[in-house]
């Protein structure tokens, strides 16, 4: 415990907060180039083939980013936009690829939560989504 005199001389130091997505360098999104697109398996107890991409960002940092939604058109050398946000059951995946921007297409036939997946408004002639 410091004395009052020591506190007058030095004061309390603030604990530095650690960011969850350091590669973004305080930016909301960053652009990058896919160096590898592959699938990986999640931690126990989940089971799936999760689509991920290794991305070299414009600041030369290489990160692993998750590709959300069903189906994608990404391959090596695709230009993508990444945002923060981890995937809980994939260790080391701390970023998401933004669907519907740059080379990434939106999710086809998406009816709900469209803005999160870069899907356009469905045509008026198409059958409406059935409610339960």
Swiss-Prot record:
Biological process, per Gene Ontology: translation
Record has Ribosomal protein as a keyword: yes
Pfam families: Ribosom_S12_S23
Keywords: Methylation, Ribonucleoprotein, Ribosomal protein, RNA-binding, rRNA-binding, tRNA-binding
Residues with PTM 3-methylthioaspartic acid: 89
Low complexity composition bias: residue spans: 118-132
Superkingdom, taxonomy of origin: Bacteria
Stored InterPro entries: NA-bd_OB-fold, Ribosomal_uS12, Ribosomal_uS12_bac
Record carries keyword DNA damage: no
Region of interest called Disordered, as start-end residue ranges on this chain: 102-132
UniProt GO MF annotations: rRNA binding; structural constituent of ribosome; tRNA binding
Gene3D superfamilies (alphabetical): Nucleic acid-binding proteins (2.40.50.140)
SUPFAM superfamilies assigned: Nucleic acid-binding proteins
One GO CC term on file: small ribosomal subunit
Summary of the function given for this chain in its UniProt record: With S4 and S5 plays an important role in translational accuracy. Interacts with and stabilizes bases of the 16S rRNA that are involved in tRNA selection in the A site and with the mRNA backbone. Located at the interface of the 30S and 50S subunits, it traverses the body of the 30S subunit contacting proteins on the other side and probably holding the rRNA structure together. The combined cluster of proteins S8, S12 and S17 appears to hold together the shoulder and platform of the 30S subunit.
Quaternary assembly: Part of the 30S ribosomal subunit. Contacts proteins S8 and S17. May interact with IF1 in the 30S initiation complex.
NCBIfam families reported in the protein's UniProt record: rpsL_bact
PANTHER family hit by this protein: 30S RIBOSOMAL PROTEIN S12 FAMILY MEMBER
Record-stated family: Belongs to the universal ribosomal protein uS12 family.
Protein name: Small ribosomal subunit protein uS12
Organism per entry: Chlorobaculum tepidum (strain ATCC 49652 / DSM 12025 / NBRC 103806 / TLS) (Chlorobium tepidum)
Name of encoding gene: rpsL
């Amino acid at each position: 415990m410091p004395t009052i005199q020591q506190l007058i001389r030095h004061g309390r130091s603030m604990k530095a907060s650690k960011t969850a997505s350091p590669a973004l360098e305080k930016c909301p999104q960053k652009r990058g180039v896919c160096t590898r697109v592959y699938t990986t398996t999640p931690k126990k107890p989940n089971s799936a083939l999760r689509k991920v991409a290794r991305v070299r960002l414009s600041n030369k940092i290489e990160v692993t980013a998750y590709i959300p939604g069903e189906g994608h058109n990404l391959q090596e050398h695709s230009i993508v936009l990444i945002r923060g946000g981890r995937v809980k059951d994939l260790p080391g995946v701390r970023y998401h690829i933004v669907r519907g921007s740059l080379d990434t297409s939106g999710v086809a036939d998406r009816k709900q939560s469209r803005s999160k997946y870069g899907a356009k408004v469905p045509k008026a002639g198409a059958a409406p989504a059935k409610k339960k």
